[in-house]
Amino acid sequence: MPLIQPPLYLTFLLLMLLYRIITLYVWSLSTITYKTSVRHASLYQRSFFRWSVDHSL
């Protein structure tokens, strides 16, 4: 029994660590992509607005 117990505990710890890392990575990735997409959208809107104004004249 003691031979089986430590590996299970270790695997559980590893799984928890992996889960934490994945959630952190996904959260940071989503935050970064959201910020960049918002920035790009605002830039695109601004340039598009300028282009439409220029071409209307």
Swiss-Prot record:
Instruction: Tell me how this protein sits in the membrane.
Output: Single-pass membrane protein
| Side Intravirion, residues | 30-57
**Transmembrane stretches, by residue range?**
9-29
Q: Does the keyword Transmembrane apply?
A: yes
Keyword Transmembrane helix included in the entry's annotation: yes
Name the predominant localization.
virion
**InterPro entries linked:** SH (IPR001477)
Q: Which keywords accompany this UniProt record? A: Host cell membrane, Host membrane, Host-virus interaction, Inhibition of host NF-kappa-B by virus, Membrane, Transmembrane, Transmembrane helix, Virion
Any single Gene Ontology cellular-component annotation: virion membrane
- What Pfam families does this protein map onto? SH
- Annotated compartments: Virion membrane; Host cell membrane
Could you give a single Gene Ontology term from the biological process aspect? symbiont-mediated suppression of host NF-kappaB cascade
Leader peptide range in chain numbering: none
Topological domain (Virion surface) residues are 1-8
Q: Which family does it belong to?
A: Belongs to the rubulavirus small hydrophobic protein family.
Binding partners and assembly: Interacts with host TNFRSF1A, RIPK1 and IRAK1; these interactions interfere with host NF-kappa-B activation at the level of receptor complexes. Interacts with host protein UBQLN4.
| Protein's job | Plays a role in the inhibition of the host NF-kappa-B pathway. This inhibition occurs at the receptor level, by preventing the signaling of TNFR1 as well as IL-1R and TLR3.
Protein's recorded name:
Small hydrophobic protein
